[in-house]
Amino acid sequence: MHVTALHVRQFRNHKEYRCRLAATVNVIYGSNGSGKTSLLEAICLAYKGTSFRGHDKDMVHRESEWYRVSMSDTTNIDRVITFDNRGERARKQWTVDSKSTARLPQKFRYPVILFTPDDLRLIDGSPARRRKYLDDILSQLNPTYHTALRRYERALVQRNRLLKSRDVSSDQLFPWNVILSESGSMVISTRRQFVKTVNDSITQKYQQIAGAANKDEVSVEYTAKDTSAHALLSHYEDCFERDRLQGYTTAGPHRHDIQVSLRGTLAENHASRGEVRTIILALKYIEADMIAAQFGMSPLILLDDVFGELDSTRQQHLIETFNNQQIIITSTHPIEGIDFAHQIRLAEG
């Protein structure tokens, strides 16, 4: 499947804009503020069901109270999203295959791989950012993981609520410890398996983007030690006094982290911005492979301002890496030397 056309009205800074898209590489270029990222957001909204930038009211053009997004693709099923902020209550509606709903039905959701400049903070940002990265991709790949994660998070809220009471007993916490250990074990083991799969190919993907002459090795490590439900249960019980004094659960998968190394040292300390960008893009490449293997379909690839800090060689290799998939790239300038790319100039305003 690939997107063939998009049409937006009163969306972000676009009063109205429409364009056709090619089945392979599309480069939407224009000056900063011309609305390139907004078009990727519209595609994400139509196929994933969510925006990566904000709330519906933020998406409405400053001179309007409504927006409309429509997409056509090779399935011949048109998608239309409308949002109307007029009246007492805002109304949002998806119309797909001539059926209207308040949310995008699961059967019409399509996998999307998105890169934004904010992803560069994955390497040197907070552990919470890296956990969110793991949780987002694993929830997309594995509904069982998503269920276990939600169960863990609900139990964590209840346990932390009890820990805020000075007279809480270990017996009161035990039922929540059991849920945390059972669901937490599944969360940890799935994260570990994902990291193992990433390590099997990330160096190859990195070198593929960086160029054949590059011999740098990349590795990812998940920091958790205990995996079994029994070990986690013992750990929660052993931490009772510390948790009671702190007033929250001090250990578990909600505190874990991943570390990325380049050439044997932590990437956050030594990697250049171009190397960090290449690592993130290698991860996106692996995500695309996993989704294709899991669902038997190639995801849409949306790359926002992807070429910053990448030399021309890495730009060329990046495009070749995602060969035979639809890629929609934004840039401040047309991409030279890629004859097969469909280049779309976006005028400001």
Label each region the model flagged:
Residues R121, K132-F174:
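Long, charged N-terminal accessory/stalk domains
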Residues M1-S31, D171-E182, M186-L300, E309, ...:
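Conserved NTPase motor "head" modules and their coupling/switch loops across ABC/AAA+ ATPases, GTPases
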Residues L45-R129, L138-L141, Y145, N199, ...:
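Nucleotide-state sensing region of NTPase/ATPase domains
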Residues C44-G49, I286-M290:
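Walker A/P-loop NTP-binding motif
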Residues D304-V306:
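Walker B catalytic acidic pair
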Residues K36:
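Conserved lysine of the Walker
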Residues D339-G349:
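A short helix-turn-beta junction within AAA+ P-loop NTPase domains corresponding to the substrate/partner-engaging
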